[in-house]
Amino acid sequence: MSDKTPPPTVWPTLRANDARALIRFLVDVVGFEETAVYGETDVVHHAELSWPLGGGIMLGSVRDDAADGPTPAGQCSAYIVVDEPDALCARVRAGGANVVVDLHDTDYGSRDFAIRDPEGNRWYFGTYRGAPRAS
C-alpha cells in the first residue's frame, strides 16, 4: 500500500558555517534522514533532511553571494514532534549534544527537551502535536 500522506509544504531553512558537519550531527546524533545533499567539497549549496515522523528541513553553507544577502549560522529554532522523548534525549546526550533544556513534563501535557547544535541552532523536541485543525 502506498503512502498517501502529502509531502511537507513548510520547510524550515538554515545556514551553517560547516554544513557537512551539521548534516552529520543531525543525521547521526539526532535522527534526521539524509534525503539530498548538493555541493562541492566543503560547500553545501542545498540539502534536505527528513524527519521520520514527517516534515523536514533544508540547509546549506553560509554564503556571502546569496541573492537576499548573507544569512548567519545559528539563527534557527524548531520544534520537532517525537513519540519517545526520553529515548531520544538519552541518545543525543550519548552523542555529545548540548542539552539546554532538560527533559521535563509541561503544563500543557507534553514531554519536552531542547538542544543547541554545534552551529548554535536550537532544537526543541516533544510529544505535543499542535492544536487540532478546525474542520
Q: How would you label these PLM feature ranges?
A:
Residues M1-T13, I23-R116, G126-S135:
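Vicinal oxygen chelate
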Residues E119:
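C-terminal catalytic core of tyrosine-transesterase DNA break-rejoin enzymes
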Residues L14-D18:
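Short, surface-exposed ligand-recognition loops at beta-strand->loop->(often short) alpha-helix junctions
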